[in-house]
Design a protein with these regions (language model features):
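Interdomain "pre-motor" coupling segment immediately N-terminal to P-loop NTPase/helicase cores
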Residues: 1-23
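Generic recognition of long tandem-repeat/solenoid scaffolds
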Residues: 8-11, 203-208
Length: 208
């Protein structure tokens, strides 16, 4: 699909959400080559994800009961150091605090939303018809994010996911339950790949 002709423009986040400029394109080629490993599937095939593939990824895991996801941290760092995409983080459990303003980071996410008001504001901005720069939306617990939104916000979130490519947006999210019945219509189906851990704790990789 061809990219929209609208020139990229940075749109501000809500004042309550930390805002920092994105890094320049000096590490663009490195970011495109970097792959994030997820172990092996049930057939022994290595499972990985990379930024340049442009595929929306959903990881089945419980953010409330698990330690912070190393894979999410790697995806965030790859995005931050690559210079090809801005990073927007929705983190309702505040599991990835280092993204919220670590002084040691040379740059940080465009937005780090943790409260219901902040999440609502981020979703509203992403649903805007104005096309911004390429972005990665990293959601640490999709179910909790949906629960934080009202009906209008949930409808907007589903629309953001369905129309993501038209807005140069790449989705990466975790959730404890991938059953579409618990989510706004079209939200789960918008993800291309789903990584799920079965009882034997071996990752499986589903292509959508």
């Amino acid at each position: 699909m061809s990219m929209p002709a609208t020139p990229p423009t940075r749109r501000p986040c809500r004042p309550s959400v930390p805002v920092r400029p994105a890094r320049g394109p000096s590490a663009r080629a490195v970011a495109c080559r970097t792959t994030i490993p997820f172990g092996r599937d049930n057939d022994g095939t290595p499972v990985s994800w990379d930024l340049s593939a442009g595929r929306h990824l959903l990881i089945r895991r419980d953010e409330r009961r698990s330690s912070p996801s190393v894979s999410l941290d790697l995806i965030a760092m790859t995005t931050l150091t690559g210079g090809t995409h801005d990073l927007v983080v929705v983190d309702p459990h505040r599991r990835h605090r280092w993204l919220g303003g670590s002084a040691s980071l040379p740059t940080g996410p465009c937005c780090w939303a943790t409260t219901a008001d902040q999440i609502t504001g981020v979703v509203a901005e992403l649903d805007s018809p104005v096309v911004g720069p390429p972005r990665v939306l990293l959601v640490a617990d999709l179910a909790a994010t949906v629960a934080a939104l009202d009906d209008e916000g949930r409808t907007r979130l589903a629309r953001v996911a369905v129309d993501a490519r038209e807005h140069q947006l790449l989705l990466v999210a975790t959730t404890a339950d991938t059953n579409p019945r618990w989510y706004p219509e079209g939200l789960i189906d918008a993800f291309d790949d789903i990584v799920a851990r079965r009882r034997e704790e071996r990752p499986s990789f589903g292509l959508r």
